């Protein structure tokens, strides 16, 4: 596996007796307001002892602003709808061809460590990419998952170009996580041009198809579930 540290370091396996995580797909493109309402409802149920949930969706084109978003990074404010959200991070784009995984887990049943949870989400993406022979990497100073682009010109400081392939942004309530990750499968990468993604202008954005992999969303979903189970444990529900 590429860039994996010890399993113990990123393990977020549940306590004995914890029920499997529900794995659910949304039909069609989900409006962002509907997604937030669903997460709010599910988080309340989970905090009250309900089963945890991973909800896989695609959105219509939109931008979201995290709690650290700088208004200057919204380059084209009228291009798509913009939603303020309570997740961490800055501006990001969501749209068709991007797999968004809303991860709603009770860390009291696992490990009450926010940094470890974020690292575990990165690990899920890295494992997913590894199954498709793509080397994803994490950076200590940049949340998300990155791929090196040796075919591109070097950066101004002489280092190799890198593009972001997956973004992360989370929120917690009573130690229950929500929001989650977005993995670029085949979105319109031009749509990222309306923002400075995650407030980082020195690096670009890529997708699996942009890297030359003619994959379908269903192919990615299978690998994503396998990777998730390796890090977070058993799931149940739709195949």
From Swiss-Prot:
Gene Ontology BP term (one): protein modification process
Record-listed substrate binding positions: 87-94, 167-169, 180-182
Pathway in which the depicted protein is active: Protein modification; protein lipoylation via endogenous pathway; protein N(6)-(lipoyl)lysine from octanoyl-[acyl-carrier-protein]: step 1/2
Main location: cytoplasm
Cellular component GO terms, alphabetical: cytoplasm
InterPro entries in the cross-refs: aa-tRNA-synth_II/BPL/LPL, BPL_LPL_catalytic, Octanoyltransferase, Octanoyltransferase_CS
Site positions per UniProt: Lowers pKa of active site Cys: 164
GO molecular function, one term: lipoyl(octanoyl) transferase activity
Subcellular location: Cytoplasm
Record keywords, A-Z: Acyltransferase, Cytoplasm, Transferase
Superkingdom per UniProt: Bacteria
E.C. no: 2.3.1.181
Catalytic reactions on record: octanoyl-[ACP] + L-lysyl-[protein] = N(6)-octanoyl-L-lysyl-[protein] + holo-[ACP] + H(+)
Catalytic residues in the record: 198
Limits of the BPL/LPL catalytic domain: 48-236
Note in the entry: In the reaction, the free carboxyl group of octanoic acid is attached via an amide linkage to the epsilon-amino group of a specific lysine residue of lipoyl domains of lipoate-dependent enzymes.
Protein function: Catalyzes the transfer of endogenously produced octanoic acid from octanoyl-acyl-carrier-protein onto the lipoyl domains of lipoate-dependent enzymes. Lipoyl-ACP can also act as a substrate although octanoyl-ACP is likely to be the physiological substrate.
Stated family: Belongs to the LipB family.
Name of the featured protein: Octanoyltransferase
Gene label: lipB
């Amino acid at each position: 596996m590429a860039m994996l540290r010890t399993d113990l370091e990123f393990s977020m396996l549940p306590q004995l007796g914890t029920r499997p995580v529900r794995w659910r797909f949304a039909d069609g493109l989900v409006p962002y307001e509907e997604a937030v309402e669903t997460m709010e409802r599910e988080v309340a149920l989970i905090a009250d002892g309900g089963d945890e949930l991973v909800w896989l969706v695609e959105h219509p084109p939109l931008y979201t602003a995290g709690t650290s978003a700088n208004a200057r990074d919204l380059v084209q404010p009228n291009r798509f709808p913009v939603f303020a959200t309570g997740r961490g991070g800055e501006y990001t784009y969501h749209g068709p061809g991007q797999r968004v995984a809303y991860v709603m887990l009770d860390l009291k049943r696992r490990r009450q460590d926010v940094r470890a949870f974020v690292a575990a989400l990165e690990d899920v993406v890295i494992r997913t990419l590894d199954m498709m022979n793509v080397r994803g990497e994490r950076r200590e100073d940049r949340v998300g998952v990155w791929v090196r682009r040796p075919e591109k010109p070097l950066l101004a400081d002489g280092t190799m170009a890198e593009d972001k392939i997956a973004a992360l942004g989370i929120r917690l309530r009573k130690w229950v996580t929500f929001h989650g990750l977005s993995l670029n499968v085949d979105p319109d990468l031009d749509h990222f041009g309306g923002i400075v993604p995650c407030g980082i202008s020195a690096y670009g954005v890529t997708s699996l198809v942009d890297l030359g992999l003619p994959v379908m969303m269903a192919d990615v979903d299978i690998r994503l579930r396998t990777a998730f189970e390796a890090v977070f444990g058993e799931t149940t529900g739709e195949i």
